[in-house]
Amino acid sequence: MVIFPEKRSSKSTADLSLISDDTWAVLSENDTLGFVVRAGEIYVALSGSDLHHAVEISQKHRFDEAVASVRRH
């Protein structure tokens, strides 16, 4: 899955988009920064704009920490 920035409104203030029951896209104004996937009690932070090719960058116990990892990477 690829989330195309040109399909999003530039006026959107959303930082996260739920794309499945356990997967969120982390968004900037113009780009998809990465994803957070819930795996049991762990949140896996992935970097990259394509979910199927994103690279794992961290695993966190808290959702907000996983999102912060994606934003920092």
Annotated model-derived regions:
Residues 26, 32-33, 45, 70:
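Residue-level detection of beta-strand scaffold positions
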Residues 34-55:
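Short aromatic-glycine-(Arg/Gly/Cys) micro-motifs in beta-strand/loop hairpins
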Residues 21, 29-31, 40-41:
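Short strand-connecting beta-turns/loops that link adjacent beta-strands
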Residues 1-27, 49, 57:
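Negatively charged, low-complexity tracts enriched in Asp/Glu with abundant Ser/Thr
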Residues 58-73:
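Charged low-complexity stretches with an acidic bias
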